[in-house]
Amino acid sequence: MTINIIEYNRSYKEELIEFILSIQKNEFNIKIDRDDQPDLENIEHNYLNSGGQFWLAINNHQNIVGTIGLIRLDNNMSALKKMFVDEGYRNLKIGKKLLDKVIMTCKEQNIDGIYLGTIDKFISAQYFYSNNGFR
């Protein structure tokens, strides 16, 4: 199985939104909908145009199996957003590949720090971030 990490492409917009909502609602039972996440409606404006980036992990069938976003806060700080990996694709190092892409991009752009926020329900995410050097 090959997983490719690609830059966001508008043709994936609806699949991206459904992918993230499905994980939030079905897996973590978070009461959230599309209107609560306006950043997903316009990735170009909310991520790309401000110096950030958004990547997708794509499987052999060209379906999204992971996401990660990077918002540029100022010249040397950024924030990690919307990191999700499909439950059936976890433990395949996809999250690590996505996070490595963010870290490499930050180094290339001389970004000194990456903020991230998570919630108590994302226990495995907290463990993952801690194991990858986040405090």
Region annotations inferred by a language model:
Residues 6, 71, 90, 123, ...:
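Nucleotide phosphate-binding site architecture
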Residues 96, 120-135:
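Conserved active-site alpha-helix within GNAT-family acetyltransferase domains
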Residues 90, 107, 130:
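Short polybasic/polar patches that bind polyanions
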Residues 106-118:
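Conserved GNAT acetyl-CoA-binding A-motif
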